[in-house]
Structure formats: structure tokens, C-alpha cells
Amino acid sequence: MLTRRSVLAGAVAGLLAPSARGAGAEKPLRQSAATRGRFFGCAAGSYQLRDADFALALARDANILVPEYELKRLIVEPSPGKFDYSGADALLGFANAHGMKMRGHTLVWYAANPPWLDEKVLGAPDDEILTDYIERLMGRYRGRTHSWDVVNEAIHLDDGRADGLRDCIWLKRFGPSYVDLAYHTAKRADPGALLVYNDWGCEGGEAWNDKFRAATLKFLDAALARKVPIEALGLQGHLNAFGTGVDQRKLRTFLDQVRAMGLRILVTEHDVDDSGAPLDIAARDRAVADASARFLDVVLDNDATIAVLTWGLTDRYLKAPGGIRATLSGYMPRKLPLDTNLQRKPMWRAIARAFDGAR
């Protein structure tokens, strides 16, 4: 019978002597990253650890891990005052057993909240609905997490505010100062954890991306001027293989500006959407790898960048999109480094080359 102990032991063996299951003579990504003083990792769910082959692949390639859902408030506090840490604890145990760091994601977000939270926040007489949760969650993992996405996706230009902030329950209840409150609380709760602001939209080459980059710089600059302890920017890195793509010049300039603020940079949720693509797998895989390479070659050329995490390691757990095209063609997304059989794809090799060429 496969037990948790046997999975962990097997994964360690996989690290010491990589099997022929896709390992070959190529270095694991964690080794390529570590050679350049960086981390490589991915998001995972605790249920995936029951898949022994996946656990081997994860232990082989990753030296940093982030829970995909199991540190979001919807999962952690499904009803008021009732907390479930089981999934995050399992992932942390796996990370510790395999010499990995673990990230926390995410403390304050407009989404993935339990249904009861909106009413509680809007009617809260004080700030404890925000601060108590941060203190409890970060306190539980104090000294055991590399970094936290404290505030996630606070910017939303379509809401039309001069400061660019998203109109969400936290803004409605506390005003813009909810950002300050969250980071100051987080710094007190775990002074050793790197505090990250995480968002998407800074990567692309369209006109709205230009506006989003400008708004992000304005947001960060204003927060730092107020002595808000934001210490790093998380670039989610969700790309589209058949969209406009990355403008490398603009991205490089933006990252240089972030670095000049004294912030570190992490790629936190990288994947490459291949929907709307030709059905030919080889063509899709090439396009996904090319998009990833154009992005990571710039990001890893900046010495403020400390980590790259993909939003999952393998296509094995991805779901088919809806719609007639997917139904008739059998289309399945291929947006992550390993395929459904845990074999290395061109995207995996693009990531490896980006680390090998990193500054």
C-alpha cells in the first residue's frame, strides 16, 4: 500500500538518483536555479502528493513550493472562526522533507473568500477582521515561510479611481489604507518573511499593459514613500502563446524601475495559455516555450529576480475548457513544463536555458 512515508522516501530517492522517467542527463530545474542563486518551484495541492509519480517529479525539480488554494481564506476559514490548515500543513511537511522553501499565498484578496466574509467585513466595527486573520495565519507559519503574497491584485484600472485601486470589500471598509494595514500587520507577525505585492498585467505588450505598468509603479512608489513594508513585486506571469506577447524592451525597463526602488522580483504563477491554437501538439509546445523564453530571458537578466514559480508543474491536473471546439477536437491545455505523463516539454527546457543564461 502506498503511504505518505513511502511517497516521501521515494521522492528523496528520486532526488538522489533520477529515474529514466524523463530525467535523462539534464539537470533538474532546482539545480539550474540554485546555480544562479535563484529558486524554481510551482504551485501544488496537497491532494497531488498522493500521486507518487508526481511527488517524485516535484521533489526532483522544485526547491520552492506554494499552495495553489490551501492558504486562501476560502479554504483556511470556511466559516467564521473555524480554521483548516491541513492542506497547507501537508505541503509544508513535503517541502521540509525535500529541502524546499514554501511561500504563502495569499492573505488579502478580493476573490477566493468564504461567502460569509463580505457581510462581516463591511459591518466590522474595527480592523480585526483583517488583522486577526493575518496574525493568526502568519503566526502559525512564522519562521517557516520564505515569502507571503500579502495583498493580491489590488490594482484594477477599469474601476476608474485616480489611484488605480480595485473597488473591493477591503477598499469599501478601510479605504486605501487597507494596504498599509495589511503589510504592517504582516511585518509584525513574521519579521523574517519576505513581503510581496502580487499582480498580473505588467508582462504584456498591449496598450493597457503600458497603463498597468505605470499604475503599478505609482502604487509601489506611493506605498514605499509611506513606509509600507512591501519588499518584493510578484509578477504572476500568465502569458498567451498566441496573443500579443511580451514586449521585452518595455518589460526590461519596468523591471529596472522596480529594482531601482530596492524591491526584489519573483515570478509567482507562470503559465502559458495555448487556447485558440493549432491542434498540432508540436506547434503548440513550441509556441508555449517561445513565449516563456521571451518572458524569462528578460526577467532572469535582472539580478533583483530571486525566484520563478509556475502555476502547476504538469498538465496532468489541467481541465479541458468548455466549448464546442474542445468537445469535438479533444483539445487539452498544454501550458506547464511537464506533460500529462510527467515528461519534459519544450517549456521545461526554455526555463532551464533561461536559468543557465541568467545574470
List each model region and its residues:
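N-terminal secretory signal peptides and thylakoid transit peptides that target proteins
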Residues: 1-15
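C-terminal segment of N-terminal export signals and the immediately downstream linker at the start
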Residues: 19-43
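Acidic (Asp/Glu)-rich catalytic clusters
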Residues: 32-35, 53-62, 89-101, 140-142, ...
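Short, acidic/polar
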Residues: 47-59, 130-134, 211-221, 292-295
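Conserved, mostly hydrophobic/aromatic
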Residues: 65, 95, 148, 233, ...
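Substrate-binding cleft and catalytic face of glycoside hydrolase catalytic domains
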Residues: 66-69, 76, 87-202, 274
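Aromatic-rich peripheral "rim/lid" segments of glycoside hydrolase catalytic domains that contact
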Residues: 149, 153-159, 164-172, 250-257, ...
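Glycoside hydrolase catalytic-domain groove-lining segments
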Residues: 173-181, 190-194, 214-218, 222-278, ...
